[in-house]
Amino acid sequence: MVKATKAEKKIAYDTKLCQLIDEYTQILVVAADNVGSTQLQNIRKGLRGDSVVLMGKNTMMKRSVRIHSENSGNTAILNLLPLLQGNVGLIFTKGDLKEVSEEVAKYKVGAPARVGLVAPIDVVVQPGNTGLDPSQTSFFQVLNIPTKINKGTVEIITPVELIKQGDKVGSSEAALLAKLGIRPFSYGLVVQSVYDNGSVFSPEVLDLTEDQLVEKFASGISMVTSLALAVSYPTLAAAPHMFINAYKNALAIAVATDYTFPQAEKVKEFLKDPSKFVVAAAAVSADAGGGSAQAGAAAKVEEKKEESDEEDYEGGFGLFDEE
C-alpha cells in the first residue's frame, strides 16, 4: 500500500472537514489537553450515531475553514477561526447540544499529578491515616504537613492545601500523592465554545433552564422599557407608560392654564371646591353601606321566615301537648 504524501493528507483533511461543515450546523469546540488516544477512541464510540469528532492542528483546521468559506460563500463559518486556539478539536453533531456535552463529560478519567504539570484544580489532602510507616515522615516534613504516629502508621492531623490551581506540580508533591494513591486530576474533552448556525456562545448557556431564560428575558424588557422612557423613544413595551405620562402632563397643563378638555373639567371642579371630595367619598361609602344594610335586612327577613316555619311545624304536630 502506497503511503499518502503530506500534500495528499492535507487535501484529504480539507475535504473531510468541508464535508462535515456542509452536513452539520452545530459544532462543539473542545479542549483536548492531556487526553490520550484510547480515551479519545472511547469518546468517539460513545458519540457514534449523531456526532463526529475531528482532531487536527489549528493551522490545518483554520485553512480548511477558510477554503470552505471561499468555495461556498458561507462567511458565518469564519466565526470559528478565533476559537481554534491551543490544543482543541471539533465535535460535529446533529443531536441536542446539552445532551452531547453531558455525554462528552462522562469520559473524564482520573490522572496522577505528574511533575511539571499545571494543576487545573486545588489539591487538598484530607486528614486521616495514610497507611505509611514512620520511615516515610520525611515526605510530609518537606511539605510542612503536620502528622503524628498512630498505631505504627503516619496520620495527617489537619487538611492541607498541597497544590493551588494554576501552580506547577513539584517532585515532592507528585511523590507524596503517588504514595498516598491519590489521583487528584481528571482529564477529558472540555467544551469551550458552541457554534450553532453561525452563532457562537459559551457552553454555560446550555445549562440555562426555561425559568432562567424567562427571567432574563423579562429583565431585558424592563431595561429596554426604562431606556426608552428615559430618551422618549417609543417601543411596544414603553408605549403604555408614555401615553399615561403624556396624559398626566396634559392634565397638569390644563389645571395650570385656561386650556381644558372634558377629562380635565372634573379635576378642575374638585380643585375649585375640595368639599366635593368629601361628598364623593361619602357617596361611595353610602353605596357600600347600603349594600351591606340590604344584605343584612334580607338575612333578618329570611331568619324570621325560618322561625315562623318552625312554629307552624310545632303547632301542627304536637302529639304530647297537654290540654
From Swiss-Prot:
GO annotation, biological process: ribosome biogenesis
SUPFAM superfamilies: Ribosomal protein L10-like (SSF160369)
GO cellular component, one term: cytosolic ribosome
Residue positions, PTM Phosphotyrosine: 313
Signal sequence extent: none
Keyword Ribosomal protein: yes
Chain positions with Phosphoserine modification: 308
CDD domains noted in UniProt: Ribosomal_P0_L10e (cd05795)
Keywords: Phosphoprotein, Ribonucleoprotein, Ribosomal protein
Annotated Acidic residues bias: 308-323
Positions of the UniProt region annotated as Disordered: 287-323
Record InterPro entries: Ribosomal_protein_uL10, Ribosomal_uL10, Ribosomal_uL10-like_insert, Ribosomal_uL10-like_insert_sf, Ribosomal_uL10-like_sf, uL10_eukaryotes
Disulfide bond sites: none
GO MF, one example: structural constituent of ribosome
Coiled coil: none
Protein family (similarity comment): Belongs to the universal ribosomal protein uL10 family.
Role: Ribosomal protein P0 is the functional equivalent of E.coli protein L10.
Subunit: P0 forms a pentameric complex by interaction with dimers of P1 and P2.
Name by which UniProt lists this protein: Large ribosomal subunit protein uL10x
Organism: Arabidopsis thaliana
Taxonomic lineage from the root: Eukaryota, Viridiplantae, Streptophyta, Embryophyta, Tracheophyta
Chain's gene name: RPP0C
